Amino acid sequence: MEWLGKYWWVLVLVFLLGVLLNVIKDLKRVDHKKFMDNRPELPPHRDFNDKWDDEDDWPKKK
């Protein structure tokens, strides 16, 4: 178990490499063209800044 104390970072790198390979493999399976054709409509953006930002910080144009 002494080697685990010295080389724990190798195990972490192997784990991260495995996660990265699985992510790449899963992303290759995604059909982006099919998703873009069937994507849901987004609701309109609602901005509530107009309710509290009454003061005008910009200089007035003459």
Swiss-Prot record:
Residues 36-62 are annotated as: Disordered. The keyword Calcium does not apply. Keywords: Cell membrane, Membrane, Transmembrane, Transmembrane helix. It is found in: Cell membrane. It is a single-pass membrane protein. Residues 52-62 have a biased composition (Acidic residues). The chain crosses the membrane at residues 4-24. GO terms for cellular component: plasma membrane. Residues 36-51 have a biased composition (Basic and acidic residues). It comes from the Bacteria. Belongs to the UPF0370 family. This is UPF0370 protein ESA_00777. The lineage of its organism: Bacteria, Pseudomonadati, Pseudomonadota, Gammaproteobacteria, Enterobacterales.
